[in-house]
């Protein structure tokens, strides 16, 4: 009884803050991107484990090396070219700019550009993982690395820019939920071609 009375007294004297500062929004949005990126990275690691289970025992180490190398190559290429290619699309356009990305975000943008880059990089790696699983034991490692670089620097950023970068799909009212079309459609089409 005493606890209920004290809870009523305390709650009547306290006021909840209804708005959050720009800095608080920046921190929480950036943290959300980082957490989401880590979860997508675990998904890509799961693809590696699935792929390792689907191949013969002698190919498991090659599959693991292919997935680690894919992460390194995709991250570097997406940083150098892919991010600006995806987000540099003019409104209703098709292709962004071929420039090296620099983070120009501040508290007014609502999130850190690096957190968004990390999140999107994990999606690039997941897209390449779809292809990796489809061509397991049917492609040598170096041609796959070349393909992963092309996928991270050209193919995926262009299709990503059509929606998330404000391109022609976004202008047409297309709605994509968490990459269900962009990531899996692009990865599936590339896997089918492979």
Language-model features: locations:
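Hydrophobic alpha-helical transmembrane bundles of multi-pass membrane proteins
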Residues: 1-194
